[in-house]
């Protein structure tokens, strides 16, 4: 992708400037917080920085056992984004499956303002993770992201065709990196 000819300043410390044609919106206008409970028959999900939000059965590592009161866990739908206690380290995770997850997590449901594939990359970017760190509460190893703070920060919104182009470019670059990793392992 070519560099943009002109940029404009934003009022966001985490993102000082964006291409001139882009807009910014507050996160609360792109997502709403879902907190549905009472679905004990849904599969248990885990949030993984490497895999996204997936069923616990697919996640090989040891995880904390779910509480007995499964009806207290939050419902996650495919396409939601999940803020976990590790999001300040690795970004917000995309839900590839429907199920239930810890009530300590924040579920962000899309308002369909932007392409989820675009936000998946944005939510894992270094700059966005720095923004998440500025919204942390707590002092223990796993820390909460205060969604009431986060939702008032602005995110960059290119046009939908441009979002798609950015995703295609990043998918292509990731595939090259993955091929190089595969060659190195052989």
Where are each of the predicted segments found?
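Interdomain signal-transducing alpha-helices
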Residues: 119, 163-166
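A short glycine-rich beta-alpha junction/loop motif
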Residues: 7-9, 85-86, 99-106, 139-164
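Ligand-binding loop in jelly-roll beta-barrel domains
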Residues: 110-115
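Sequence-specific dsDNA recognition surfaces
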Residues: 10-11, 25-78
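Amphipathic alpha-helical coiled-coil segments
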Residues: 170-184
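Short, ligand-facing micro-motifs at secondary-structure edges
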Residues: 40-62, 81-106, 117-121, 130-136, ...
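Non-catalytic DNA-recognition/assembly elements of restriction-modification systems
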Residues: 6-39, 152, 156, 160, ...
């Amino acid at each position: 992708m070519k560099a943009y000819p002109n940029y404009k300043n934003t009022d966001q410390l985490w993102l000082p400037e964006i291409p001139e044609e882009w807009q910014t919106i507050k996160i609360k206008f792109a997502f709403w917080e879902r907190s549905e409970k009472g679905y004990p028959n849904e599969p248990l999900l885990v949030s993984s920085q490497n895999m996204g939000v997936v069923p616990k059965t697919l996640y090989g590592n040891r995880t904390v056992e779910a509480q007995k009161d499964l009806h207290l866990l939050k419902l996650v739908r495919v396409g939601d984004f999940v803020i976990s206690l590790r999001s300040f380290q690795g970004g917000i995770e995309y839900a590839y499956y429907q199920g239930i997850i810890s009530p300590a997590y924040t579920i962000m449901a899309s308002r369909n303002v932007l392409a989820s594939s675009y936000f998946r990359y944005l939510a894992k970017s270094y700059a966005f993770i720095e923004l998440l760190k500025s919204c942390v509460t707590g002092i223990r190893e796993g820390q909460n992201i205060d969604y009431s703070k986060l939702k008032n920060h602005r995110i960059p919104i290119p046009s939908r065709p441009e979002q798609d182009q950015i995703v295609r470019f990043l998918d292509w670059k990731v595939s090259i990196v993955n091929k190089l990793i595969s060659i190195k392992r052989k």
